[in-house]
Amino acid sequence: MLQFPPFARANHGPARQHRPTGPHPAANADNNAPGPPGPRARQRPPTPSHNVGRPRPPTPAHARPTIEGPHPYTGGMHDPTLSTMEHRDLVEALALSHVLPHETLPAEECLGRRLAVDLRSLIPLPPFTNSAMDGFALRREDLAGDGPWTLPVVADIPAGDTREHLLQAGQAMRIMTGAPLPEGADTVVKVEHTDHAPGVAQAPDTVQVRVAPKLGANVRVAGEALEAGSPVLTAGRLLDGAALAAAISVGHGTLTVLPRPRVVVVSTGTELKQAGEALERGQIPDSNGILLRGLVEEAGGRVVAHLRTGDTPEELRRALDEAPDADLVITAGGISAGAFEVVRLTLGTDAGFHHVAQQPGGPQGVGSTPVGARGRETPVICLPGNPVSVFTTFHMYVAGALAVMSGLVLPERGATVPSAVIARARVGWESPEGKTQFIPLRFVDEAGACSSAAAGLGGGEAVVPEAGVRWVEPVHPLGSKSHLVASLARAQGIGVVAPERGAVEAGEELAVVALVG
């Protein structure tokens, strides 16, 4: 399995908190100066270094981005171009500087959360020696010789009985499944092997045992399944019903879980309309809002507000000021090179904007901004407005940031930074030279004709998939174009094509971030 450069580098357990320092890789000595006045303008805090957590040789002076004109982080026209690695480092540094504390909750409230620490048994399992069957507890030595054997029944022990019982030689006690084995008993004979009928009935005065069991039969000894102190669950485990049952069964009433970062999602653009509203010329449904809400929840975050604003800085600033407290703001749209880029105009002194050498989703922004009535400084990640760009860049960067902020460091699918599998292209397609391509793909596991979605990509003849090999094809004939939102429902992975490649030929291998099992 190909592992992408990870956000969190610990092996197991909660992530350690790091405080990034240093300037942006493209910044110079004057780059921390405040920009021109704007809505709620103030001096921009230092942008995290792109070298946090990953030693890397210094970039030669001739290879560094050249910045001309106004500083790029105050709305200038000349944004630096970063590699996908450099942008990932900026997002990583932002997340590492805002790692959230663990939460301790009643176990019953932890469904769907992730365990923050390794869990060990507080008690043995079973916690006491008990009967594995409905029947009669006795001493095996009392069944000597040939049967049947008749014994007096001196007590009736239901499940949950807390009384102390002492079994004497030559006696029997009726016992139910799960009930504590009385002191002195070492064997349980099933009710079916006696003259006593199963079911609801009074305990008999005597019992006739017709089949002699082995010594220790139908007895569960305390601790035979699990000793106290034994490991039960590991940190990072998703707490489903089975995991919670295991935790409670070994004595845990509360659990320490990873936090779910609170996220404010912001869709920008006067052209956006609520789902189902009638559309006028130039208007489109706001698909980014529900897309981001779903992606955030799937990645372990919790959306506390979805804001939809127009293209004026005053409107966006007011919406952020009135938003609830959050741990992260994610914006969609308003960061490109147009005349009405509302996010850039509003957050120009708060966030760093740059271009990433990737397709789709070149324009990106990272920083922090005041949110809520108290003006709490909150991390912000700014994404482009095209839905395919939102989809791919969220999976490649933002999902990992949420995992880091929550302290999750285990590389589980859909929960941390992308891991890739190697697959082969069912058909060929073009890839832009000089840019990393993130292309939504579907897996093709059966031989046959090329799907209509992948037809006409211009990569030569389609290849018939071989058994035992994972094959992929684009979900849309136009490949990775950023406006193809309707095709995202078919996406099962994101192909990663290196910038120097230029094209993918049918049958060639490529890395694929799998979004499904």
State where each predicted segment sits.
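Aromatic (phenylalanine/tyrosine) cluster motif
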Residues: 4-7, 73
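Compositionally biased, low-complexity flexible segments
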Residues: 8-66
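Helix-rich terminal scaffold detector
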Residues: 68-85, 253-383, 387-393, 411
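Short, glycine/charged-enriched hinge/interface segments at domain edges or termini
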Residues: 73, 78-79, 119, 136-310, ...
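Intrinsically disordered, low-complexity, positively charged segments
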Residues: 79-148
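Flexible glycine/proline-rich
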Residues: 85-88, 103, 107-108, 116-117, ...
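Short, conserved secondary-structure segments in the cores of folded domains
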Residues: 115, 127-128, 153, 163, ...
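Solvent-exposed alpha-helices and their adjacent loops that cap or buttress functional pockets
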Residues: 129-131, 143-146, 164-168, 181-183, ...
